[in-house]
């Protein structure tokens, strides 16, 4: 009985890890695929301006959101 419970637990953990990896890959694909524009400027990859992120980086106010694609994907630019 304990072996069966342990096997079921391991299967659940493996499923969760696989699902997390799939979700991460989908997010990375969106970041690579979507180019956004902030204030009419074309994307500037050297400063990551116009790149879609799932949250604008920098709690210090160095990044700000200029457009929203979905509830979780934002177009960000350096302030």
From Swiss-Prot:
Record carries keyword Disulfide bond: yes
Keyword Methyltransferase: no
GO cellular component: extracellular region; nematocyst
Name of the protein this chain belongs to: Delta-hormotoxin-Cpt1b
Native source organism of the sequence: Calliactis parasitica
InterPro entries, alphabetized: Myo_ane_neurotoxin_sf
Function, as annotated: In neuromuscular preparation of crustaceans, the toxin increased neurotransmitter release, causing repetitive firing of the axons. May affect sodium channels (Nav).
Disulfide pairings: 36-75, 38-66, 56-76
Location in the cell: Secreted; Nematocyst
Any coiled-coil regions, as ranges: none
Record-stated family: Belongs to the sea anemone sodium channel inhibitory toxin family.
Pfam families noted in UniProt: Toxin_4
Positions annotated as propeptide: 21-31
Signal peptide residues on this chain, from the entry's feature table: 1-20
Top-rank lineage group of the source organism: Eukaryota
A GO molecular-function annotation: sodium channel regulator activity
Keywords: Cleavage on pair of basic residues, Disulfide bond, Ion channel impairing toxin, Nematocyst, Neurotoxin, Secreted, Signal, Toxin, Voltage-gated sodium channel impairing toxin
């Amino acid at each position: 009985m304990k072996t069966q419970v342990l096997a079921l637990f391991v299967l659940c953990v493996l499923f969760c890890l696989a699902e997390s990896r799939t979700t991460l890959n989908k997010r990375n694909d969106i970041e690579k695929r979507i180019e956004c524009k902030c204030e009419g400027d074309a994307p500037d990859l050297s400063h990551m301006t116009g790149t879609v992120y799932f949250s604008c980086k920098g709690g210090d106010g160095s990044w700000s959101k200029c457009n929203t694609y979905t509830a979780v994907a934002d177009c960000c630019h350096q302030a």
